[in-house]
């Protein structure tokens, strides 16, 4: 379909006698909405990047949903908040599909902390050191998991993280064993990603999009499939999220999680009591150096743990993964101690908890390299993009 004919068709949908008015009670045709939808449709057909500010009341959601659901392209709709994700998935998209008489396959893909990790649930239940209060909650999760269709923790009857067991039943990217996991075939996250691969339209979030851009730029795999069209609602949040995603973070909690995971694996092996004891003593040195805010000494002490983990790399899939995680932490500490060109390092603290961070000084260049260079047209929308009526600052931050 030509650019003009596609844009004309989209325009007709918004008219007082169009598809939306016929199917949606109370619909009012607004010229600003029609114009925005036309701009979006044109960009989708011609390619490129559209940066558009849509003030509250413009109706930007309909302005991008109609062309997104009318086109034949594979589309990603990314948001900053879960509330908007749910609104799109369960209210807006079904309503617009019905109004237009179209039936595109739609999938929702969330971050990994929203999905049950069967392997970590199993390990937590098998751990004899699991506290009675935690075991009770874990058993409730286990019962729910047997009946859950998708393993999305949103359908759990209680908040697992508020109950103190969230980290025991989910896996971070560092903890995930990937295709080597014994639960790969029944993993809720894998199934959600497969559904996204097969869908015409995927609803997701900015953090996941940026994580995917980071992985693809380094040839380390992918989180999301490739898309012809990427629509970023609530786009104003992208630059700040990019600072975090394309930087590095080292907190004592991250190091402690690694140590606890390593201890659990060594305990399971049954014949590594000496290494288990040595690592505990070495981690105490890491902990002391971190609390004394001596990151250089943290690095030296941590390298001993890296060596210990690497020496046991071949013992199991889990020890190999832990060795990789230890090396990744080592590289992050080194980068923070000696920031590469274009990056800045700093320290944040909350009470006694400190985090050392590294981030790009300017987000524009890194977004240009890792995101906008991809073979997809991009549509960036927000109610707040201009400053003093100008897009100049936003354009600089977006690259």
Give names to the regions the model predicted.
Residues 3-52:
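Conserved pre-motif I regulatory segment
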Residues 2-23, 73-202, 207, 301, ...:
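A substrate-engagement module of RecA-like helicase motors
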Residues 50-53, 76, 379:
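Short hydrophobic/aromatic beta-strand immediately N-terminal to the Walker A/P-loop
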Residues 41-42, 61-74, 91-95:
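Walker A/P-loop NTP-binding motif
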Residues 70, 86, 91-94, 173-174, ...:
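Signature of the SF2 helicase/ATPase Hel1-core->accessory helical subdomain module
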Residues 73, 102-105, 225-228, 374-376:
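Short glycine-/polar-rich loops that comprise or flank the Walker A/P-loop
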Residues 167-202, 213-221, 299-399:
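A contiguous, basic/glycine-rich beta-loop/short-helix subdomain that forms a polymer-engagement track
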Residues 56:
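The conserved Walker
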């Amino acid at each position: 379909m030509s650019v003009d004919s596609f844009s004309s068709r989209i325009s007709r949908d918004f008219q007082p006698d169009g598809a939306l008015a016929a199917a949606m009670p109370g619909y009012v045709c607004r010229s600003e909405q029609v114009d925005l939808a036309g701009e979006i449709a044109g960009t989708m057909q011609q390619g490129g990047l559209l940066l558009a500010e849509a003030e509250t009341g413009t109706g930007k959601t309909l302005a991008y949903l109609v062309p997104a659901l009318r086109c034949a392209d594979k589309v990603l709709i990314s948001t900053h908040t879960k509330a908007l994700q749910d609104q799109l998935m369960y209210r807006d998209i079904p309503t617009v599909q019905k109004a237009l008489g179209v039936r595109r396959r739609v999938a929702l893909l969330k971050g990994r902390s929203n999905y049950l990790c069967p392997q970590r649930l199993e390990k937590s239940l098998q751990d004899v050191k699991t506290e009675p209060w935690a075991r009770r909650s874990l058993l409730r999760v286990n019962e729910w998991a047997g009946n859950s269709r998708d393993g999305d923790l949103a359908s759990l009857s209680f908040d697992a993280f508020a109950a103190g067991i969230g980290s025991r039943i989910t896996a971070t990217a560092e903890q995930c064993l990937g295709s080597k996991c014994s639960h790969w075939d029944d993993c809720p996250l894998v199934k959600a990603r497969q559904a996204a691969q097969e869908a015409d339209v995927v609803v997701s979030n900015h953090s996941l999009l940026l994580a995917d851009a980071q992985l693809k730029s380094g040839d380390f795999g992918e989180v999301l499939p490739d898309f012809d069209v990427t629509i970023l609602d609530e786009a104003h949040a992208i630059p700040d999220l990019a600072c975090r995603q394309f930087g590095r973070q080292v907190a004592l909690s991250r190091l402690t999680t690694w140590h606890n995971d390593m201890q659990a694996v060594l305990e399971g092996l049954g014949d590594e009591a000496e290494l288990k004891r040595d690592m505990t003593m070495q981690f105490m040195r890491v902990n002391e150096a971190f609390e004394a805010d001596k990151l250089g000494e943290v690095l030296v002490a941590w390298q001993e743990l890296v060596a210990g983990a690497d020496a046991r790399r071949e013992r199991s899939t889990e020890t190999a993964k832990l060795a990789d995680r230890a090396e990744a932490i080592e590289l992050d500490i080194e980068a923070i101690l000696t920031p590469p060109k274009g990056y800045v390092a700093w320290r944040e603290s909350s009470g006694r908890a400190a985090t050392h961070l590294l981030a790009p000084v300017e987000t524009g260049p890194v977004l240009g390299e890792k995101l906008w260079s991809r073979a997809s047209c991009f549509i960036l929308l927000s109610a707040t993009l201009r400053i003093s009526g100008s897009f100049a600052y936003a354009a600089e931050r977006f690259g």
